[in-house]
Amino acid sequence: AALLHGDYYCERVASLVRRALERMASLAAKVPAHDEEAAAAIMETLVLTGIAMQLAKCTRPASGTEHIISHYWECKKLTHGVISDYHGKKVGVATLVVADIYHKLGKLPKPVAHPEHIDWEDVKQHYGPELTPDMMKFNEPNTIVDEIDPKLVTEKWDEIMKIIDEEIPSTERLRELFALAHAATTPEQIAVDRDLFRDGIRYHIFMRRRVTIMRVLPMVDIDPLNVYEGK
């Protein structure tokens, strides 16, 4: 978002969050035992990310694409009168999905970006009558990526892929940490069925007016669901 849209970024804030995450990761194995040090680290991480959000004046230090996917799953379930499992459990599962997709993007040929062309009738159909009005408020009179020069996406693509490689742990490493902490890793463990799971990956991007890598993918004709499923 900083590279493509000029959004605020502060390395000191990012470092604050990194340190908190590194400590939490080092104590993952102690979480299931309700270890006092691990519990303290969890609380400290929550507080530090809260401070980071205050400093950045946005939720980015603690909330990315994985949170938006989780919100999509939750909102869709609510339209059917179903209360979801804990938000954090779904965010964890979505984190594995997003990390997998992002690392796979780096193995694809470098794309050439263009203005996006969205089938809004298809999007509205998947959001349904209950969610569409609020969803469209984030996408009218223009979308967030209408403010991005496609040439810049093409120009910065390699740099973005390098950041992914350096900053985001591999899916294998994340699964190891989740296993140590006894955290949910599959859609079945959070009661998200196959159709809802797949729709969340593909359609969550319209639920917020926020630049993410996933939100930019329509500009380069990449379907994240196809990337995730290896198609």
Question: What do the predicted segments below correspond to?
Answer:
Residues 39-53, 95, 178, 200-205:
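Short alpha-helical scaffolding segments that buttress acidic/His motifs in well-ordered protein cores
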